[in-house]
């Protein structure tokens, strides 16, 4: 939803002029935005964000992931995980910027720099990763492994936003799920059975 993206970016921009708070977009998660921030920034956000049912919601143990607030972690992570721990890969991987890392087609230094750099300190665009996977690999069905069921809705929202397989909205997606599912969440017993057919 472009309106939400613009609103989130405007909030982050507004904080650039406030010296005692820090916020940034942590994760683009389907139709939701997850923010990262220091304590003062998160309090400020709670006051600024519109109230909607259960939102804004503060995630347990999530404050600074995928944000500049973790910049100090990068040297520690690299000290504990040398580049020699990174191999050529065996299946394609898509990162939080939507880049595909094809097996044997990238340097260990490059994936190391992303994994223990930008992945820690920059926005993780889950929506973009899902959209790139759907567009580039053209799956018959998208299977969400987990954890639990929390990624099903954001995955569906990302697919709808990109018009994957002609999806035009929530009602269209729900109707297609009834006839021949295109998204399976392994965290749901009844959907897990669809994947086992």
Predicted stretch roles:
Residues 1-19:
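Short amphipathic alpha-helix segments
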Residues 44-45, 129:
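Hydrophobic side chains in well-ordered alpha-helices
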Residues 50-51, 110, 158-161:
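Short, solvent-exposed amphipathic alpha-helical segments in soluble enzyme
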Residues 31-37:
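A generic structural motif
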Residues 54-145, 150, 180-185, 191-196:
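Acyltransferase
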Residues 22-28, 58:
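Short beta-strand
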Residues 37-44:
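Helix N-cap motif at beta-to-alpha junctions
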Residues 151-190:
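Short acidic, glycine/proline-enriched helix-loop-strand junctions
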């Amino acid at each position: 939803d472009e309106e939400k993206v613009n609103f989130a970016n405007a909030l982050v921009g507004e904080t650039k002029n406030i010296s005692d708070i820090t916020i940034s977009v942590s994760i683009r998660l389907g139709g939701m935005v997850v923010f990262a921030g220091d304590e003062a920034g998160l309090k400020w956000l709670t006051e600024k964000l519109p109230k909607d049912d259960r939102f804004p919601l503060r995630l347990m143990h999530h404050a600074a992931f995928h944000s500049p607030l973790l910049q100090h972690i990068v040297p520690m992570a690299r000290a504990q995980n040398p580049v020699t721990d990174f191999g050529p890969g065996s299946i394609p991987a898509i990162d939080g910027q939507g880049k595909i890392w094809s097996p044997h087609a990238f340097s260990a230094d490059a994936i190391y720099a992303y994994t223990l750099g930008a992945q820690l300190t920059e926005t993780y665009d889950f929506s973009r990763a899902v959209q790139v996977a759907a567009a580039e690999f053209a799956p018959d069905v998208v299977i969400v492994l987990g954890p639990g069921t929390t990624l099903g809705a954001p995955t569906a929202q990302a697919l709808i936003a990109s018009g994957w397989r002609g999806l035009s909205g929530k009602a269209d997606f729900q109707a297609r799920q009834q006839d021949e599912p295109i998204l399976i969440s392994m965290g749901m017993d009844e959907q897990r059975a669809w994947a086992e057919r």
